[in-house]
UniProtKB/Swiss-Prot annotation:
Binds 1 zinc ion. Zn(2+) binds at residues 21, 24, 36, 40. This is DNA gyrase inhibitor YacG. NCBIfam families: PRK01343.1. The gene is yacG. InterPro entries: DNA_gyrase_inhibitor_YacG (IPR005584), Znf_NHR/GATA (IPR013088). Residues 1-28 are annotated as: Disordered. GO terms for biological process: regulation of DNA-templated transcription.
Amino acid sequence: MSGEGKKHGSNVEPLRPTRPCPECGRPSVRERYPFCSERCRNVDLNRWLSGSYAIPVADDESKADDEDR
């Protein structure tokens, strides 16, 4: 009976499906999601810190018009 519990417990469903790593395309791993390795994770972090990635900001022209008056 104790052998059945171990067999059933070893078949755990992952919380999320594996997806391709955004850096290299290999399957992601749970510990470093959405990346496949620490290297790919650090490459992405370096791009954010160096300014390679930027979030576009749209100027709100209605506020600019109000400030001019």
